């Protein structure tokens, strides 16, 4: 059998027997094709150009036939540092810069290994137990009985390319992508030599270079400098869909804009569930929106210091929620008195401005996604940015996005900055404190050819975006029966006695029966009184979100809750 190999050195082919082992294949490639210019530790075997591949030194004695290799198959060789460069870097001084500062490089995130076992999100642990196969029914091409199976009806892998194209799925789900990468990276490796298939991109200069030269900017070599950045459409997305538990959540958030005409911003709180519209998909279910202190204007919002952040997080945790994103408005009435708004964001302008993408990258860096399949223990983020704006028909619409992993890596390396043009992101200039690698972006021209362009000094911000879908459930079953956030404004506009009096009305028997406590803003207002302890607040949250007889008895048995009732009733 003849196998073909492609690498940065060109094309080559070699003849093997089906009974030859992978170890024999690697030895022949190193000697006959690479002319012993590379060591086994610096060459990886890949099935396609996007794979990380398997290092030659990790290939075992599995036969080529058992490994699934066929006559004429194209394989790819990922080449590392040649032996000549390794020898020269060990014997010769690296490039130095006279008079440069001693130490200004940033840590290489990808080199960090998790020091403790990674605790993933429950949704990730749950999806890892799913087989993820796409079931297919019998077709007219099948020639077997109901208990048989053939190529036309056998289940497909969750990352099957034909299924993705037929169903117009733009991005693979994260777990489908993970299985695709893992099957390629660890296909030939034994169970004793597992290789983490995921690695977060890093575009910073490595601090501890094995060449022994002074750190950047006093010295740099091919081992420690970041590689060229190629901006492409990210093939996967960590979150596939955003679902608002009820339309009232968005409607309540929009009320302040309707009343003032000023823009608003808020943090979304919810949880993650499996999304069945794509194989192994994840959706974020938003149950509440909290609006932090802000200065609103007609054309933007400025966030102020958030003193109650820890308390809001505590209340959210008590309700079984977590912060999953941020949402803001960009609405301008079109002046027709018909309820329609201007369409500002579309394919000919922008979807998220460069400043918004920059801020989203900042949030995604703070809220990383723990992942045991990554070398660093983290991969991507589940933090989602949603914007409420006008569509092409002048209707108010929610659109959700994430910044790609390369986008967040560029932000972490301090290589990008927003520009005055909302559709363009600037690449920063290199200086004594910042090494800037080559940045390219690739697009399809009018002739259908792939064209690469230099991203300096600026590039389209759309290359950093990942688009999500969003919507509402067919049968809403929200965690909170009441989404009115005006209670916060009412309480903040009165004195202490007035606040207690307003809260006391919510504990009336008839009011409780109508769901007065089933409101995230109300629970937060009660928590601000500092009467209930952490466990008692959790008991109140359990009753507010699930008003069962058992939860009611548990709440009434708590001394601090009775103290709260006494204080509130005394204000009436």
From Swiss-Prot:
Residues 87-116 are annotated as: Disordered. It is a peripheral membrane protein. The keyword Cytoplasm applies. InterPro entries: MPN (IPR037518), Npl4 (IPR016563), NPL4_C (IPR007717), Npl4_Ub-like_dom (IPR024682), NPL4_Zn-bd_put (IPR007716), Ubiquitin-like_domsf (IPR029071). Gene3D superfamilies: Phosphatidylinositol 3-kinase Catalytic Subunit, Chain A, domain 1 (3.10.20.90). Involved in the import of nuclear-targeted proteins into the nucleus and the export of poly(A) RNA out of the nucleus. Has a role in the endoplasmic reticulum-associated degradation (ERAD) pathway. Its main location: cytoplasm. It is found in: Cytoplasm, Perinuclear region; Endoplasmic reticulum membrane; Nucleus membrane. One of its GO terms (biological process) is ERAD pathway. Residues 242-379 form the MPN domain. GO terms for cellular component: Cdc48p-Npl4p-Vms1p AAA ATPase complex; cytoplasmic side of mitochondrial outer membrane; cytosol; Hrd1p ubiquitin ligase complex; nuclear membrane; nucleus; perinuclear region of cytoplasm; RQC complex. Keywords: Cytoplasm, Endoplasmic reticulum, Membrane, mRNA transport, Nucleus, Protein transport, Translocation, Transport. One of its GO terms (molecular function) is ubiquitin protein ligase binding. Belongs to the NPL4 family. The keyword NADP does not apply. This is Nuclear protein localization protein 4. It comes from the Eukaryota.
